Amino acid sequence: MIKIKRWYLPQCTLGVLTVNDFRCFTLELPMLDNAPNISCIYAAGGFRGNKHFSPHNGDVVAINNVMDRTNIQIHSGNYISQIRGCILVGDSIKFLDSDNIPDVTNSKATLAKLLKELPDSFNIEIT
């Protein structure tokens, strides 16, 4: 099971993702009433996830059963500008660019490690 514990900032949503003994950080869009492409996932709760290949993002985690949303993924990327409603993962949170919004680092390597920890299908708990 993936567990994501989030905290909300005006310009983004940050979190800590754990599965087994693996831990990383998450970056999402801010909370904007669950509006597609501009908001993080509105509802905390339980979801189903599975490993998936996305033509746009490569190997990802697909998050299913998200109310009023489709095609939600955990994928690689470092900056808030690379998100359209999905979740980015990284091994640390830093300010990498000049927009004064936190970023995540080493995202591709972090996603690869996460995918190795997961079975093909699993539960996701977001709080």
Model-predicted segments: where are they?
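Cell wall/extracellular polymer interaction/catalysis modules
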Residues: 1-103, 108-122
